[in-house]
Amino acid sequence: MRNIVLASSSPRRKDLLEQIKLPFEIIPSDIEENISELSGTPAKKAEQLSYQKARDVADKVQKGLILGADTIVVIDDEILGKPKDSEDAYNMLKKLSGKEHEVITGICLLDLDNKIELIQHETTFVKFIELDDEKIKAYIKSGEAFGKAGSYAAQGVGAIFVKGIKGCYSNIVGLPLNRLGNMLEKLNEKIIK
């Protein structure tokens, strides 16, 4: 298995790659996550951002496997990225309260040695419990809402908001491991030998 360059500073993606024992190093992308400037469906926008992140790092390293990913939350056709501030986080959590939403991760794998680009996405459906204002404000005060699409961490305290999940759990954490495994196999890279 060749070493992967993760084009992300996300500690959650780092943890997920460590979980499946992949050899990797981290070189974060400098790309601004400005999804509103992109065109297409939410899934296509997530794919485009994952590609931009991978391409940015590929231009720096010029060889090997580069992994880019971008996770967004979609509810009622509205894309929720990372909250800008407490008010933004509050509004996002209020929208998610008692409803089902989509978590979409665009994933891009660039094999620079063989000039192959794989770009895909994974969608997981997450249903939230009803959240009262007190719970939302306490969660925001904890600090966990920040730096995460949709203002919650399903692998943290935010798990108490999740009533149900349809699809890939690791996708809502930030990286769909099953999809990544399939993409690596297309490049003849085996996670399990």
From Swiss-Prot:
Site-annotated residues for Important for substrate specificity: 12, 71, 155
Name of one Pfam family that matches: Maf
GO biological process, one term: nucleotide metabolic process
Catalytic residues of the enzyme: 70 (proton acceptor)
Main localization category: cytoplasm
Location in or out of the cell: Cytoplasm
PANTHER family: BIFUNCTIONAL DTTP/UTP PYROPHOSPHATASE/METHYLTRANSFERASE PROTEIN-RELATED, BIFUNCTIONAL DTTP_UTP PYROPHOSPHATASE_METHYLTRANSFERASE PROTEIN-RELATED
Stated name of the protein: dTTP/UTP pyrophosphatase
Lineage per the UniProt record: Bacteria, Bacillati, Bacillota, Clostridia, Eubacteriales
